[in-house]
């Protein structure tokens, strides 16, 4: 909830309900003016900045020593100071303890399916990695109308939970003596229509691309790989009209689009509650990290 605003801020006011976002939307740069991009020149994620853009200084300190901002949001605190371009004003009726999860990973996976993969109704989608982002990608495929959603994960204990998010079938690569892209091709008469990769493992990224059907298949990469990783595939995979795409924050523009994602929840089209397994008081934040391990 906005407590106060700085000079010149007109888009939000004290009392407004907002979602803080690690990336932003200045609404002035070429990316913000493009209907295709959310990679704001001014406010895109910068993990090294640690200060406010306007004056290059931190707004936090302890015993006179500065504490630097964390990914532009510093939300591991009860009060924070942010650039107005990194807060999305939302419906004040939306429960903040639920829709807060839309500030990062859930929107990333959801948008990867809905905005980037864009599976046609009745299509088949493979989701690689069934962590929170992957489950959100499955949820996005469900909302889009995919009829088969195949979860791919090395941890079979995740499969039952993934059914709640629309997954209809599962593949554990360890159960097969052939590449998983071949397994998926055999299951789907030549390949899936769409795939969404949510692990960041370079081998899974390649598999996610090579498992899509020639002629119309689209693979979307969400996971962040190791900085030295190299994506290698045969050029014929492209010449046979497979498409490879990347995405950042589900292609959502934070200020423009997140209010609409919240409305999906308010209209009961997006089921946020099933992403939440525990609630802990702020004083036990480290316990929350332990629960995610």
Curated annotation (Swiss-Prot):
Domain of life from the UniProt record: Eukaryota
Enzyme class: oxidoreductase
Binding site for Zn(2+) 2: 26, 29, 32, 40
Locations listed in the record: Cytoplasm
Protein name: Alcohol dehydrogenase 1
The species this protein was found in: Zea luxurians
Chief localization: cytoplasm
Keywords: Cytoplasm, Metal-binding, NAD, Oxidoreductase, Zinc
Cofactor info, note text: Binds 2 Zn(2+) ions per subunit.
Residues involved in NAD(+) binding: 129-134, 153, 158, 199, 222-224, 249
Subunit structure: Homodimer.
Family according to the record: Belongs to the zinc-containing alcohol dehydrogenase family.
Cofactor(s) essential for the protein: Zn(2+)
Molecular function terms from GO: alcohol dehydrogenase (NAD+) activity; S-(hydroxymethyl)glutathione dehydrogenase [NAD(P)+] activity; zinc ion binding
Residues holding Zn(2+) 1: 104
């Amino acid at each position: 909830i906005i407590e106060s605003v700085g000079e010149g801020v007109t888009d939000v006011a004290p009392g407004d309900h907002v979602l803080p976002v690690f990336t932003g939307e200045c609404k002035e740069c070429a990316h913000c003016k493009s209907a295709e991009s959310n990679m704001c020149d001014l406010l895109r994620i910068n993990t090294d900045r640690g200060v406010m853009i306007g004056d290059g200084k931190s707004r936090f300190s302890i015993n006179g020593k500065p504490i630097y901002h964390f990914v532009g949001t510093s939300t591991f605190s009860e009060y924070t100071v942010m650039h107005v371009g990194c807060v999305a004003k939302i419906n004040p009726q939306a429960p903040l303890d639920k829709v807060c999860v839309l500030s990062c990973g859930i929107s990333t996976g959801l948008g990867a399916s809905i905005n980037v993969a864009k599976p046609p109704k009745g299509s088949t989608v493979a989701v690689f990695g069934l962590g929170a982002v992957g489950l959100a990608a499955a949820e996005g495929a469900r909302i889009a109308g995919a009829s088969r959603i195949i979860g791919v994960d090395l941890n079979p204990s995740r499969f039952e939970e993934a059914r709640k998010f629309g997954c209809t079938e599962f593949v554990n690569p360890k159960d097969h003596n052939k590449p998983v892209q071949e397994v998926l091709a055999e299951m789907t008469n030549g390949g899936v229509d769409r795939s969404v990769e949510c692990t960041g493992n370079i081998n899974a990224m390649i598999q996610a691309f090579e498992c899509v059907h020639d002629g119309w298949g689209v693979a979307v990469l969400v996971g962040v790989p190791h900085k030295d990783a190299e994506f290698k595939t045969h050029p014929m995979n492209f010449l046979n009209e497979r498409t490879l795409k990347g995405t950042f924050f589900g292609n959502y523009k934070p200020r423009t689009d997140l209010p609409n994602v919240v409305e999906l929840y308010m209209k009961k089209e997006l089921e946020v509650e099933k992403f939440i397994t525990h609630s802990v008081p702020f004083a036990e934040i480290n316990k929350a990290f332990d629960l995610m391990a």
